[in-house]
Amino acid sequence: MTTNTFTDPPVEMAKERGKTQFTVRDVTNFLNGGEEETQIVEKIMSSIERDPVLSVTADYDCNLQQARKQTMERVAALSPYLVTDTEKLSLWRAQLHGMVDMSTRTRLSIHNNLFIGSIRGSGTPEQFKYWVKKGAVAVKQFYGCFAMTELGHGSNLKGLETTATYDQDSDQFIINTPHIGATKWWIGGAAHTSTHCVCFAKLIVHGKDYGTRNFVVPLRNVHDHSLKVGVSIGDIGKKMGRDGVDNGWIQFTNVRIPRQNMLMRYAKVSDTGVVTKPALDQLTYGALIRGRVSMIADSFHVSKRFLTIALRYACVRRQFGTSGDTKETKIIDYPYHQRRLLPLLAYCYAMKMGADEAQKTWIETTDRILALNPNDPAQKNDLEKAVTDTKELFAASAGMKAFTTWGCAKIIDECRQACGGHGYSGYNGFGQGYADWVVQCTWEGDNNVLCLSMGRGLVQSALQILAGKHVGASIQYVGDKSKISQNGQGTPREQLLSPEFLVEAFRTASRNNILRTTDKYQELVKTLNPDQAFEELSQQRFQCARIHTRQHLISSFYARIATAKDDIKPHLLKLANLFALWSIEEDTGIFLRENILTPGDIDLINSLVDELCVAVRDQVIGLTDAFGLSDFFINAPIGSYDGNVYEKYFAKVNQQNPATNPRPPYYESTLKPFLFREEEDDEICDLDE
C-alpha cells in the first residue's frame, strides 16, 4: 500500500536532510559543550535505550496504577547510578531520560536533588556523612522526599505552619501539624515510597518563632514500611499528568526527632536552646535554586524533542496547494507555518544558552558558599558577597525558571497544533508531554509569583547600584551609562541585524524599565511600607522580570556564538537574530515607549523576521538533527528520523490496539441494549407534513 499518491515521505526527508549546509556534529558539540561531552551524552543515551526496563514505547496506554509500578521499576533500574555517577553524569542522565519519562525523572530528582540536595546544602558536613551512612545516597533501606508545600501555603515559605518545637528536657524537636491547612500536600514520593522527608517547619524555641527551617523526619519503619508513630500519610490520587509520581499528604502529631535532625549548616540550636541564625535566610534555600536551575535545562530538552517532531513532520506533510499544481505543498513551505515554528526553534536554542549560564553560576556560587565558614569573622566580607550573589541567583533563577517553563509549554502546544489532527493522537506524545510538563509552571514556585519576586529583586539591585554597592555580574548593566535613543530617523537594516545593537537595545529597554520602577518605588515608600509599595508596582515588577530575562537569554546566546566553529556561526547567528527580532515583536510597546525603535523600525523588523524564517527553513532538519535524538527519545511516529511517518504511525496504532474483535467489550451490556431499545411512544416523523 502506498502512503500518499503524490509523495514518498522517506525520500522527501532525505532530500530535506541533504539541504543542510553545515556539519551537524559541530552544532551538536556546540550545544553539548564539546566532542567529549557529546560522547558522554551518547553513551548515556545508548545505555538508556538498551535497557528494556526503561523502554517508553508503550507508556501512552498505561493507567494510574500501571504508571506507578512501572515508574518504580525504572527508579530501581536507575538508582545504582546515583552512587556511581559523577555530579555531571547524574545531571545528564536525569535530563536525557526525563525528556521521555518525566515521572521517573521526578521521582529520582525529588530524592537526589531536593532531599539529598537539602542535606548537602543546609546540613553540616557531619550531618551529611551521617545520612550517607544511613543509606540516603545509595537509596538502600532509605528514600527521601521534600515536604515543603502545605494545603494552605505553597510559594510563601514564611507562611508555612507546620511546627518544630524544641523540648530541652529530651533534646528533641516535636513536629506537629496544627490544623488541616498545615497538612503537607503534593509531596512527591510520600504516598508509597519515602521513608524520610526533609520537612519545612517553623522553628519554635522557648516559645519564640525563629522562622522556617529544615528538619529530617522519619516517616516509615525501615523493616516493614509501616508508618512511624504520629505520622499520617495519604495518596492524593489522579493528577493532570505525571501519573507515575506518588504524590501524597503528610500530617504529624507529636512526632519526636533528635535535635541533630535539624539541618544546621546555617541556623543552629544548642542543647540548651540557644538559637544562632544565619546571615541570610536564602542561604538555606539552596535546594530550591538547584531545582529551578534544573527546570531551565529541562525546558530546553523537552522543547527540542517536540520541535523535532513538529519540524520533521512539517517537512514531509503535504496539504493543499496552488491551482494547477500536481503536488500539494509541504506545510513547512507555508510562510505562516514557518512563522509559527521557526522562532520557537530559535527560542529553544536560546534556552540552552541560558540554562548553561544558570548552571555555571549555580555551581560557582554553591562551591564558594560551601567553602566558607559562616562563623569565621575573618570571612565576613566573603560571606557578605556570597549572600549578595545568592540573593541575586535566587531572584534570577526564579525569573528564568518562570519564562523558560512557560516557553516550553507554549512550544509543546504550538507544535501539537502545527501537526494538525495527528498532533492530538496520544501516540505522538504531545498530550502526555503537555500534561506532564505544565506542573513545572507551578511547583517550586508559581511562575507569576516568581516573576514578581524577581522584579522585586531587580529593584533592590538597582537601589544597591544607586548606592554604589556590589551587585552580581548579570545585573551590572543597569548601572551602565550607554543607551540607545532614536532621533526619529529610524534604524538601518544592517543595524537591526547587528548583535551589538540588539543586545544594547534589550539592555536599554530593561535598564529603563527597572530604573523607572525603582523611581516609582522610592516615591511610594515615602508614604507606604516597602511591602505595600512593591504590591502597588506588581505589573511593573512583572514587566521588569520579563524584559530582563529576555535580554539575558539574548546576551547569553550571542556571547556563546563567539565560541562556535566558523562553519556554524552564520547559522547560529541567524537563529539568534531571529530570536531577538521576534522577541521585539512580542514586546513592541516597550521599545516604542522607550524611544529605542520607531514604528517604521517595527515594520522593518516584521519583514526581517519573515526573511530569517525563509533563511532558516532549509536548515531545520540539520538544526533538529543536531539535538542528537534517536527515535527512542522522540517516541512519536510522526517525528521519526527517516520520515516514514504514515506507515510507522499506522503500525503504532495497530500495535497498541490490535483489531481482534470488531465488537467492544461492552457490546452486550451497553451498546446492544442501546441500539435495540424499544420506545413506548415511538412515532415516525413525517417530514412531508
Curated annotation (Swiss-Prot):
The active site is at residue 444. Its main location: other. It is found in: Peroxisome. GO terms for biological process: fatty acid beta-oxidation using acyl-CoA oxidase. The keyword Lipid metabolism applies. GO terms for molecular function: acyl-CoA oxidase activity; FAD binding; fatty acid binding; flavin adenine dinucleotide binding. Pathway: Lipid metabolism; peroxisomal fatty acid beta-oxidation. Keywords: FAD, Fatty acid metabolism, Flavoprotein, Lipid metabolism, Oxidoreductase, Peroxisome. It is an enzyme of class 1 (oxidoreductase). One of its GO terms (cellular component) is peroxisome. It comes from the Eukaryota. FAD binds at residues 149, 188. Its EC number is 1.3.3.6. Its cofactor is FAD. It catalyses: a 2,3-saturated acyl-CoA + O2 = a (2E)-enoyl-CoA + H2O2. Belongs to the acyl-CoA oxidase family. Heteropentamer composed of five different subunits. This is Acyl-coenzyme A oxidase 1. It comes from Yarrowia lipolytica (strain CLIB 122 / E 150) (Yeast).
